[in-house]
Amino acid sequence: MAEGHGDAKGATAHTAADGGHKAPFPPFQKETFASQLVSLTIAFVALYLIVSKLALPRVGGVIEERQKTIDGDLAAAQKLKGESDDALKAYEAELAAARTRAQAIGAETREKLNAAAEAERKTLEERLSAKLADAEKTIAATRTAAMGNVRGIASEAAAAIVQQLAGVQPDSKALDSAVNASIKG
């Protein structure tokens, strides 16, 4: 039986030497380091050439285009800011002019209203003065008429009293002169 399975010593020796592996991992083999370094150098040079000739110019172009866009946007924003500042100054100037016009219109209207009120006041004073003069004339006429009636009534009353007391008809001139003296005071 031992013959069919082989030599036990040989199997143990073979297994112990290989450790269960056939060969070491290729990158760790010392014999292939030089060829691996050459392959790595060729790969990095090729990658550098591809990146520097194709990718970097595209990225640089994108960056330049983006910078141009940013610069253009900043210039447009500065221009619009200047325009808005100019518009604000024009608005403020127009607003100041409108205030001045409004104040002038207010002053003019105030002057017109004051002049109209003064004219109306003068007209009213003239009408009131005319009415007062007419009223004074009416009062004077009424007083004169009343005084005339008072003289007549006083003369008649005095004549009646003298006739009643003295039994004699008094002289009308003497009676009028006595009544006038009595009225004057």
From Swiss-Prot:
Keywords, sorted A to Z: ATP synthesis, Cell inner membrane, Cell membrane, CF(0), Hydrogen ion transport, Ion transport, Membrane, Transmembrane, Transmembrane helix, Transport
List the membrane topology term(s). Single-pass membrane protein
Q: Where in the cell is it found?
A: Cell inner membrane
**Its principal location?**
membrane
Cited InterPro entries:
ATP_synth_b/b'su_bac/chlpt, ATP_synthase_B_chain
- Entry keyword annotation includes Transferase: no
Highest taxon, organism lineage: Bacteria
Which stretches of sequence are listed as region Disordered? 1-23
**UniProt entry tagged with the keyword Transport:** yes
Listed GO molecular functions? Answer: proton-transporting ATP synthase activity, rotational mechanism; proton-transporting ATPase activity, rotational mechanism
* Bias (Low complexity): 9-18
Q: Cellular component terms, GO, for this chain's entry?
A: plasma membrane; proton-transporting ATP synthase complex
- UniProt similarity note: Belongs to the ATPase B chain family.
Role, per record: F(1)F(0) ATP synthase produces ATP from ADP in the presence of a proton or sodium gradient. F-type ATPases consist of two structural domains, F(1) containing the extramembraneous catalytic core and F(0) containing the membrane proton channel, linked together by a central stalk and a peripheral stalk. During catalysis, ATP synthesis in the catalytic domain of F(1) is coupled via a rotary mechanism of the central stalk subunits to proton translocation.
Quote the subunit structure annotation: F-type ATPases have 2 components, F(1) - the catalytic core - and F(0) - the membrane proton channel. F(1) has five subunits: alpha(3), beta(3), gamma(1), delta(1), epsilon(1). F(0) has three main subunits: a(1), b(2) and c(10-14). The alpha and beta chains form an alternating ring which encloses part of the gamma chain. F(1) is attached to F(0) by a central stalk formed by the gamma and epsilon chains, while a peripheral stalk is formed by the delta and b chains.
What this protein is called in its record is ATP synthase subunit b 2
* Organism, as annotated: Rhodopseudomonas palustris (strain HaA2)
Q: What is the lineage of its organism?
A: Bacteria, Pseudomonadati, Pseudomonadota, Alphaproteobacteria, Hyphomicrobiales
Instruction: Name the gene.
Output: atpF2
